[in-house]
Swiss-Prot record:
Residues 187-200 have a biased composition (Pro residues). InterPro entries: At4g02000-like (IPR040256), DUF4283 (IPR025558), Zn_knuckle_CX2CX4HX4C (IPR025836). Residues 289-303 have a biased composition (Basic and acidic residues). It comes from Arabidopsis thaliana (Mouse-ear cress). Residues 170-203, 258-314 are annotated as: Disordered. This is Uncharacterized protein At4g02000. Residues 261-272 have a biased composition (Polar residues). Residues 171-186 have a biased composition (Low complexity).
Length: 314
């Protein structure tokens, strides 16, 4: 109740009012006022999604007419600058269902989905889209029939739920539990393998016998035996004897490296080495034992195909 007409009009102009986030309907005081008059509410609605070519007063009025009774249109073709949405004040019945989307086909066959946004709307029934009650107390919602469940059925359902939960947990923790014959398709046969290339005897000889010619060995049809090999070491200050093992054939020609004496055979030993600085008288010393050893070494070199000195010219 208010005594001033200005305040009364201000209250009516600023509705709808809210109490505990629910709409409150208002009506101007009249004599013999009854509750049957409080059956409507006025809301501001924003219409969005109208194509730019059809944004005008005529289009807004035609679309808003489908919602309810139009009270005020807050749009003018000559003065309005914003066209993102059009505001219109509409009177709804308190039991009417609110509409939030509508598909409209225009004259040239262009279709558009128009959305409606209600200002100050806080609560609404998500089942019937009415603004008078909550979903939990909706009288228009169909009540789902309750099935009578016995104790044995309830226990069986609980066991099945526990089993499925454990199975899902086990599957997530161990990916191999999901493998079965129906989980994966049949694998494709692998392509045929390319045969290995034949062995090259020259490369094998170079790897196993670095000081022997490849032509002196037979053609290898399989892998060679693993024989430990050592390189010949011939140094002046070293006492290591050259290796002569079973890998070197007796009839194979012997290779002589640069700086190696041709008189030194495979099975001979270096005796009586002459060091630098010795006198000529000491070189001729040795006795009959030295001569016998020299004669044997010459015979061994002759048998092994060693190089002999040519006779002296007279």
């Amino acid at each position: 109740m208010t005594s001033l007409t200005i305040d009364l009009l201000s209250v009516l102009r600023r509705e709808p009012w809210l109490y505990n986030n629910w709409f409150v309907t208002t009506h101007r005081w009249e004599v013999n006022l009854t509750f049957h008059l409080l059956t409507s509410i006025e809301l501001w609605v924003q219409m969005r999604g109208i194509p730019l070519l059809y944004v005008c007063e005529e289009t807004a009025l035609e679309i808003a007419h489908e919602l309810g009774k139009i009270l005020t249109l807050d749009f003018h073709d000559s003065t309005t600058t914003q066209i993102a949405y059009i505001r219109v004040r509409i009177r709804f019945g308190i039991t009417d269902r609110l509409r939030f989307f509508q598909r409209i086909i225009f004259d040239f066959g262009e279709a558009a989905l128009i959305s409606f946004q209600y200002e100050r709307l806080r609560r609404i029934c998500s089942s019937c889209f009415r603004m008078t009650h909550h979903r939990n107390s909706c009288p228009y919602r169909q009540i789902e029939p309750l099935h009578r469940v016995t104790n044995s059925t309830a226990q069986r359902n609980v066991r099945e739920e526990v089993f499925m939960r454990d199975e899902n947990l086990r599957s997530s923790m161990n990916s191999q539990s999901q493998m079965s014959e129906s989980s994966f398709p049949t694998p494709i046969d692998p392509p045929p393998r390319i045969p290995h290339p034949p062995l090259n005897p020259d490369e094998l000889v170079a790897a196993y016998y670095p000081h022997t010619r490849a032509t002196s060995l037979p053609n290898f049809a399989g892998p060679l035996p693993q024989v430990p090999l050592r390189k010949n070491v011939d140094e002046r200050d070293s006492n290591i004897q050259p290796f002569s093992g079973p890998a070197f054939a007796a009839h194979s020609p012997r290779l002589v490296e640069v700086g190696e004496s041709s008189r030194q055979g495979e099975n001979t030993q270096n005796v009586h080495t002459v060091e630098k600085g010795d006198s000529s008288k000491r070189k001729n010393m040795g006795g009959p034992r030295f001569k016998d050893d020299a004669r044997k070494s010459n015979e061994d070199e002759h048998m092994n195909g060693g190089i002999l000195k040519p006779p002296k010219k007279r």
